[in-house]
């Protein structure tokens, strides 16, 4: 902890120093970190997740022994949060960074620097200057408003008129362990212009470099991606308002979260794009919320019209590459097959729902997929044309094996032992409509019928992905010992057959803001950590 205080000061020097106007402009960048007292139980909780509970407990107890009721931890107050602010100016290298360390006792803090860190702070009026090894510029700090307020290079940054008052800064409480906010609408226009100009030059240099073995289609794709970046990045920087990142670990809910949010300036094209991501309908969900989902993915994403239109010649080149690289005997079929799926790819829209669900008995699983098609009946024609000619050694294809609500269902039975081992069946059921493909791996076809009869998802988010940690490994590692899995499940959950609280979820939502949230339950991380440790023994 003694090193932590000076580490924060040294960390600030990496950002350079800033200049502010007399009226104290609001910070461009704000960072708030919870108090030591709040961080200690979080540290112990996270250590336990990674199967290091004893080490975490000892670390917390050690830090508590360093805490004094009057002087805190070497002068640092463990009951109040830490902070940093940056007010960006046109001259970026001269922009001040202000670091705020909660102060318990001035003398104890100076003793930390002089006696324990072997530094020599020198005082001029109320400002201290200290040379820190491996830091090219001097560090300045003063005691004010109950905090150690520090900066680098320019002592004038510490004048009260040059930075947001500490009380005002911490009126906004940290929303998690750490809370970072970047106000894009406060970035000086000149800085944005310079950043964009440098980015464009760098991008042009990279795109101009030849790539060994690159096909015509691959080159067109690379150039297309570069062109889209030169459109998207300026929009984000010029029309963006706030970008925030919040990290949290909550022992009560047993959850680790990373929450990223991005908002746009009102009335901009970017704000309209974000708003359009909300309140859309999508294909029916193929899994129930209360099902034993191993993996569930739902997506509704699409390229903007201009990007989609510019992608068409790129797609043509990629498909041509694919055909040319195939064996001569396969090209005829490939051309027909690619022509059938090309309209769907050209639409550049991903509207899908997929799931891998375990049966209640744990002995079988169901795979389900539903995705949007464009001119899907062309694919249906291919199935009817080539399906009956599937070699018997590979399996059996049955056209019109079943039907529900006017939807024809075909059945494909593959001679695949691995498929049967994992899912308890080798039967694949599929239905192809002009606007939709539905597919399941299941014994009797009951699930595909339910999906085809289901109503559309009225609130389709751009992306949601949910996984269950204790059920995933057997599907991704065929050599994993089933007995080892049971042992680890029992160690983490008590009863391996009733493992709960081990989900991992990623969600992307739109509306007033674009929000990317990653939530992992602690038991999920612990299960994977213990499994990794046990597998290496």
Regions found by a protein language model. Give the residues of each.
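Long compositionally biased, domain-poor regions of proteins
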Residues: 79-86, 336-362, 373-384, 388-399, ...
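In a subset of proteins, long, contiguous C-terminal domains/tails are tracked
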Residues: 9-11, 468-537
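Short Gly/Thr-rich strand-loop-strand
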Residues: 73-80, 93, 103-144, 181, ...
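Bacterial N-terminal signal peptides
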Residues: 5-16
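A conserved glycine-rich beta-strand in the N-terminal activation segment of trypsin-fold
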Residues: 131-209, 422-500
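One face of beta-strands
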Residues: 27-31, 82-84, 97-101, 139, ...
């Amino acid at each position: 902890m003694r090193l932590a205080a000076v580490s924060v000061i040294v960390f600030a020097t990496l950002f350079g120093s800033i200049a502010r106007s007399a009226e104290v402009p609001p910070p461009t960048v704000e960072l708030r970190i919870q108090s030591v007292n709040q961080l200690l139980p979080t540290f112990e909780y996270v250590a336990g997740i990674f199967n290091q509970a004893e080490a975490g407990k000892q670390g917390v107890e050690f830090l508590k022994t360093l805490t004094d009721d009057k002087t805190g931890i070497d002068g640092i107050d463990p009951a109040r949060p830490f902070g940093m602010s940056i007010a960006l100016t046109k001259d970026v290298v001269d922009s001040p960074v202000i670091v705020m360390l909660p102060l318990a006792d001035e003398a104890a803090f100076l003793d930390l620097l002089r006696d324990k860190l072997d530094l020599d702070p020198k005082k001029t009026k109320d400002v201290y200057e200290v040379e820190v090894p491996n830091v090219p510029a001097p560090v300045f700090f003063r005691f004010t408003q109950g905090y150690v307020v520090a900066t680098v290079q320019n002592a004038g940054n510490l004048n009260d008129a040059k930075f947001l008052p500490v009380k005002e800064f911490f009126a906004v409480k940290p929303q998690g362990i750490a809370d970072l906010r970047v106000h894009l609408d406060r970035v000086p226009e000149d800085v944005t212009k310079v950043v964009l100009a440098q980015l464009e030059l760098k991008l042009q240099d990279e795109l101009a470099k030849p790539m060994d073995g690159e096909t015509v289609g691959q080159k067109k794709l690379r150039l297309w991606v570069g062109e889209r970046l030169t459109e998207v990045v300026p929009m984000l920087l010029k029309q963006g308002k706030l970008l925030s990142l919040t990290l949290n670990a909550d022992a009560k809910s047993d959850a680790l979260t990373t929450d990223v949010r991005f908002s746009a300036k009102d009335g901009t094209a970017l704000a309209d794009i974000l708003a359009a991501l909300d309140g859309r309908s999508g294909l029916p969900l193929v899994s129930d919320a209360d099902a034993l989902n191993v993996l569930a993915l739902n997506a509704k994403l699409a390229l903007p019209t201009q990007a989609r239109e510019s992608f068409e010649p790129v797609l043509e080149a990629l498909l041509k590459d694919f055909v040319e690289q195939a064996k001569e005997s396969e090209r005829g079929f490939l051309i027909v097959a690619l022509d059938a799926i090309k309209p769907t790819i050209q639409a550049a829209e991903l509207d899908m729902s997929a799931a891998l669900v375990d049966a209640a008995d744990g002995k079988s699983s169901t795979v389900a997929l539903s995705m949007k098609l464009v001119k899907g009946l062309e694919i249906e024609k291919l199935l009817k044309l080539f399906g009956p000619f599937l070699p018997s050694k590979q399996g059996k294809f049955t056209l019109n094996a079943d039907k529900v609500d006017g939807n024809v269902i075909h059945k494909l039975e593959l001679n695949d032992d691995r498929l049967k081992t994992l899912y308890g069946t080798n039967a694949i059921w599929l239905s192809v409509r002009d606007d939709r493909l539905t597919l399941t791996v299941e014994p009797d076809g009951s699930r595909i019928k339910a999906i085809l009869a289901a109503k559309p998802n009225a609130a389709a988010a751009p992306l949601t992905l949910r996984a269950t940690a204790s059920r995933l490994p057997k599907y991704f590692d065929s050599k994993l010992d089933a007995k080892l899995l049971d042992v680890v499940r029992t160690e983490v959950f008590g009863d391996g057959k009733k493992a709960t609280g081990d989900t991992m979820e990623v969600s992307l939502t739109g509306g007033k803001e674009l929000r990317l949230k990653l939530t992992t339950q602690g038991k999920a991380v612990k299960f994977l950590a213990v499994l990794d440790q046990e597998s290496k023994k």
